[in-house]
Swiss-Prot record:
It comes from Polynucleobacter asymbioticus (strain DSM 18221 / CIP 109841 / QLW-P1DMWA-1). This is Chaperone protein HscA homolog. Coiled coil: none annotated. The keyword Chaperone applies. The keyword Signal does not apply. HAMAP family: HscA. InterPro entries: ATPase_NBD, Heat_shock_70_CS, HSP70_C_sf, HSP70_peptide-bd_sf, Hsp_70_fam, ISC_FeS_clus_asmbl_HscA. Belongs to the heat shock protein 70 family.
Length: 621
């Protein structure tokens, strides 16, 4: 019997019908949504023709929520309930947020991600971001008069697992199917057409409202290979605004300001900063609530001076990304500029001097990421031909592994490994009859688990009892195209399995990532010595446990003198294990103790063979 295909009324049966997928740039200051129409990407404007949606959400006492321009109007009059720059808080705890004391919000410190207290209740950054995403989804569906099948949402390349997962959760809350999380620098490269026809190595310098990213990419016949990434997810245009704000406070000799005056003056400083991108002079002119008039002039040169250390921080990250990629500045064919903050002349000049080439900025830096995301979304929706396809090879920023016996780290996936990736490694039990295994997943470059960051723990139970070292436990790490990690463990013989999707309560700050990398490099020799000692200590403990087990069952095979000799040898080994810090001394003690028990091991083997053959004739053997 033939099967009939039944379509939804009003829907086309044409197999070539385009599926509408969008690209979303969920930014710190502004957010955008874009689609591909007539083979070209375009940012979708609202009814007033505005292409940028301010990333601002306001909560009202009556339960209503405002987002975008409507909410932006309330920044000064209702600062506690009007949330700006929420991207800075995604996947973060209170201790992770820089300059938190200057923020006008009431923060709620909870295990995991922080929350913000509003008249509508405590709100997580995920909930706030979901409001912005929901408005973008509605804008897209109204523009195309159809439902969207999904979205490619961009994130900073240096976003960690917690920040990426928080972004996906926000999209889910907004009713958006995430086709992929795409790193912002890669999206920008796609938008610039650095795809099929382009060869060479490019840098993407992305300085947005709240985040900074630098990525080094190699283009080769449609393959985007990310060689290295760097940046700071807590550095952006907001920090330039704050630096200018502090300077104005100092120049005008103002006392500590109220939340209302703080927001008012900060907005005036932001406006002056933007004017200075195209004018040599600007003025911060604002009247405070008590009638005080602030009137401070500032030149381009003065702004450059007070923000120079912020620009320098981005250049340090650029140099590190080059080192990680094994390249020099002269190896870079071009530099793509992304983000509204790259309009600042001192930023463009500094980047040009570092790389020795004029940066590419012919596309609108506010739109370029969304345009690239739209092109990737169109590809994933199946709307482009094979000739238009490209392959994206992003990387993970820090090594991933597990803690083994003795607190050592066994790295499963090294840093800068292209994703998606799956790696497996076999491990075994440490003690006889061991029926469970605790697995701690860690992230970092150090040799000891205590020096790395724990991402999660889980247990594999139900391992059949057997001798130490006999069980085979296969641990598999999988990192998907979004950079999210899952880990599974399987006992090969029985098929017993356990797994975990890594969703840390909150993620690493970029300072932590940098610190972990630096500590990994600077402590390499010290770490290797510590690892060597731990390995020998594990060997010693394994021998002590094995001999103790053997004596408990077969002590009768030894005479009193032999028993005393082994007991003395084991006591000496235990003493060295407890007190010695030189791995070579521990190794010699283990070797000596092992030789001292060789005769006992031979007697046990002979007794075991004799027992197995007892009562059998030659024909049965």
């Amino acid at each position: 019997m033939a099967l009939l295909q039944i379509s939804e009324p009003g829907k086309s049966l044409a197999p070539h019908q385009r599926r509408i997928a969008v690209g979303i740039d969920l930014g710190t200051t502004n957010s955008l949504v874009a689609i591909v129409q007539d083979a070209l990407p375009k940012v979708l404007p609202d009814e007033q023709g505005r292409e940028l949606l301010p990333s601002v959400v306001r909560y009202l006492p009556n339960g209503r929520t405002q987002a975008g321009f409507e909410a932006l109007e309330s920044v000064v009059i209702d600062p506690k309930n009007t949330i700006l720059s929420v991207k800075r808080f995604m996947g973060r705890g209170i201790s992770d947020v820089e300059n938190i004391e200057s923020a006008p919000y009431d923060f709620v410190d909870q295990p995991g991600m922080l929350k913000l207290r509003t008249v509508a209740g405590d709100k997580s950054p995920i909930e706030v971001s979901a409001e912005i995403l929901a408005r973008l989804r509605q804008l897209a569906e109204d523009s195309v008069n159809d439902d969207i099948v999904g979205a490619v949402i961009t994130v900073p390349a240096y976003f960690d697992d917690a920040q990426r997962q928080a972004t996906k959760d926000a999209a889910k809350l907004a009713g958006i199917e995430v086709l992929r999380l795409l790193n912002e620098p890669t999206a920008a490269a796609i938008a610039y057409g650095l795809d099929n026809a382009t060869e060479g190595v490019y840098a993407v310098y992305d300085l947005g409202g709240g985040t900074f990213d630098i990525s080094i990419l190699r283009m080769s016949k449609g393959v985007f290979e990310v060689l290295s990434t760097g940046g700071d997810s807590a550095l952006g245009g907001d920090d330039f605004d704050h630096r200018l704000y502090c300077w104005v406070i100092e120049q005008a000799k103002l006392p500590p300001l109220s939340i209302h005056d703080h927001r008012t003056l900060l907005q005036a400083c932001k406006h002056a900063k933007e004017l200075l991108s195209h004018n040599p002079l600007a003025r911060v002119h604002e009247t405070l609530a008590d009638g005080t008039v602030v009137n401070v002039g500032i030149s381009q040169a003065q702004l450059f001076e007070i923000t120079q250390n912020l620009v320098s921080k981005t250049l340090v990250a650029c140099k590190k990304a080059l080192r990680d990629a094994g390249l020099k500045a002269e190896d870079i064919k071009g530099v793509v500029m992304v983000g509204g903050s790259t309009r600042m002349p001192n930023v463009q000049r500094a980047v040009g001097e570092l790389f020795g080439t004029k940066p590419l900025n012919n596309l609108n830096p506010d739109q370029v990421v969304a345009l690239g995301a739209a092109m990737q979304a169109d590809l994933l929706a199946g709307n482009q031909s094979k000739d238009d396809e490209w392959l994206l090879l992003d990387v993970i920023p820090l090594s991933l592994g597990i803690e083994t016996m003795g607190g050592l780290v066994e790295k499963i996936i090294p840093r800068n490994t292209p994703i998606p990736v799956a790696r497996a490694q076999d491990f075994t039990t440490f003690k006889d009859g061991q029926t469970a295994l605790a697995i701690q997943v860690v992230q970092g470059e150090r040799e000891l688990a205590q020096d790395c960051r724990s991402l999660g723990r889980f247990e594999l139970r139900g391992i059949p009892p057997m001798a130490a070292g006999a069980a085979r436990i296969r641990v598999t790490f999988q990192v998907d195209a979004d950079g999210l990690l899952s880990v599974s463990a399987t006992e090969i013989g029985s098929g017993v399995k356990a797994s975990i999707d890594i969703k840390p309560s909150y993620g690493l700050t970029d300072g932590e990532i940098t610190r972990m990398l630096q500590e990994g490099f600077s402590s390499a020799k010290e770490d290797l010595l510590a690892r060597s000692l731990r390995e020998e200590q594990v060997s010693a403990q394994r021998l002590l446990d094995a001999v103790q087990t053997a004596l408990s069952t077969d002590r009768a095979l030894l005479n009193e003198q032999e028993q005393a000799a082994i007991d003395q040898e084991m006591a000496q080994l235990q003493k060295i294990l407890n007190e010695e810090t030189d791995s070579s001394v521990v190794r010699k003690a283990v070797d000596h103790a092992a030789k001292a028990t060789d005769e006992f091991a031979q007697k046990r083997m002979n007794a075991s063979i004799q027992k197995a053959l007892s009562g059998k004739n030659v024909a049965e053997i």
